[in-house]
UniProtKB/Swiss-Prot annotation:
Name of this protein: Short-chain dehydrogenase/reductase prx1
Organism of this sequence: Penicillium roqueforti (strain FM164)
Recorded metabolic or biological pathway in which this protein acts: Sesquiterpene biosynthesis
Gene designation per UniProt: prx1
Stated role: Short-chain dehydrogenase/reductase; part of the gene cluster that mediates the biosynthesis of PR-toxin, a bicyclic sesquiterpene belonging to the eremophilane class and acting as a mycotoxin. The first step of the pathway is catalyzed by the aristolochene synthase which performs the cyclization of trans,trans-farnesyl diphosphate (FPP) to the bicyclic sesquiterpene aristolochene. Following the formation of aristolochene, the non-oxygenated aristolochene is converted to the trioxygenated intermediate eremofortin B, via 7-epi-neopetasone.
GO molecular function terms listed in the Swiss-Prot or TrEMBL record: oxidoreductase activity
Alphabetic keyword roster: NADP, Oxidoreductase
Consequence of gene loss (knockout): Reduces the production of PR-toxin and leads to a large increase in mycophenolic acid production.
Superkingdom as given in the UniProt entry: Eukaryota
NADP listed as a keyword: yes
Binding of NADP(+), residues: 60, 84, 104, 131, 162, 210, 214
Gene3D superfamilies: NAD(P)-binding Rossmann-like Domain (3.40.50.720)
Keyword NADP among UniProt keywords: yes
Enzyme Commission code(s) on record: 1.1.99.-
Length: 340
């Protein structure tokens, strides 16, 4: 039976329409990342393309990396800990084609070093997938003095993108234009970007900080589309879905118990491979060739929150704010001491 909270929200998924309407928990009929690859004829069919993924060694990162590797292209898997990365990704690593890149997006020095290392190995980058993240953690500052959720979910990725921007632009071709994909979250509903106090000094609350950072991820890709879409570089953001991963490690146990006990959550939840499907749709879906400035969920563009629905689905009105997006871009450049 279709879930009434989401049935009015679901659009056309083609062969998966019924699967998304009749959700039945992890491993149900909803597509995996590899299913999306097959549907788009991307299996072993992109040998001339280069991909870079952050947050590769845990959660949906492993499955996203597995799918990118299955394209036959060159894949750089960003990991904070090389030893952990070797263990987690052993099945897909392939010397000279699928390799690790030491990268901690919570450290701007690490981001700069990783970008320099990448550029010493490749003059090409077709898709950048910013997947690394943390959620609802206690207040903390990074080594650079930034609020940790902002730095890890957004600011480190913005810096990485800026350092690779010209490579993304020069790698774009008429048959496959370059893409930047930011993994956001339904958590963006929790807050717009607090532009006048982006580090939330004196007003920190874990979920507000998460919303602040995840909306920033959406704004970033919207602004990429505004600035560079006409030049063959596109930005897309997405909600992967409800997936049980270490991302939830800071969430109060009682809250987790409450989430897990609801029938909606049990049926809405996805496996990591299913969660990575929307990321791969954004990164490689043919329907998004030459397009961007959108927020996806369940492998399609998200609509507004349905009447009577939950914050688990749909996109908040504040996710699209051209004036705010420009201000955030300029503020981010200033925070990182970058010029345009």
């Amino acid at each position: 039976m279709a879930n009434p909270l989401i049935s009015n929200h679901i659009g056309k998924h083609g062969k998966y329409t019924q699967a998304f309407l009749e959700q039945n928990g992890p491993g149900d009929a909803r597509p995996t990342a590899l299913d999306i690859l097959k549907d788009n004829d991307r299996i072993d069919n992109m040998k001339d393309k280069v991909f870079l993924l952050t947050g590769s060694s845990g959660g949906i990162g492993i499955e996203t990396g597995r799918a990118l590797a299955a394209t036959g292209g060159k894949v750089y898997l960003g990991v904070r800990d090389l030893e952990k990365g070797k263990q987690a990704l052993a099945e897909i690593l392939e010397p000279g084609r699928v390799e690790l890149l030491e990268l901690d997006v919570g450290s701007m020095e690490s981001v700069r070093t990783a970008a320099k290392t990448f550029l010493s190995k490749s003059t090409q980058l077709n898709v950048l997938v910013n997947n690394a993240g943390i959620m609802a953690c206690p207040e903390a500052k990074t080594v650079d003095g930034f609020e940790s959720q902002l730095a890890i979910n957004y600011l480190g990725h913005f810096l990485l993108y800026k350092l690779l921007e010209q490579t993304l632009l020069s790698s774009s071709t008429p048959e496959f234009q370059s893409r930047v994909v930011n993994v956001s979250s339904a958590g963006h509903h929790m807050s717009s970007v607090v532009l006048d106090n982006i580090n939330l000094e004196g007003e920190y609350e874990p979920w507000k900080a998460y919303g602040n950072a995840k909306t920033a991820c959406i704004w970033m890709t919207n602004e990429i589309e505004h600035r560079y879409g006409s030049k063959g570089l596109h930005g897309l953001s997405l909600m992967p879905g409800g997936i049980a991963t270490s991302l939830q490690r800071h969430v109060d146990p009682e809250t987790l118990k409450e989430w897990g006990s609801s029938e909606f959550a049990q049926k809405y939840a996805k496996s990591s491979a299913q969660g990575a499907a929307t990321t791969i749709t954004a990164a490689l879906g043919k329907e998004w060739e030459g397009k961007g400035g959108v927020y996806l969920e369940d492998c399609q563009e998200a609509g507004p929150v349905p009447e009577g629905g939950t914050l688990a689905v749909g996109v908040a009105p504040h996710a699209f704010d051209p004036e705010g997006e420009k201000k955030l871009w300029d503020l981010s450049l200033k925070m990182l001491n970058l010029s345009e």
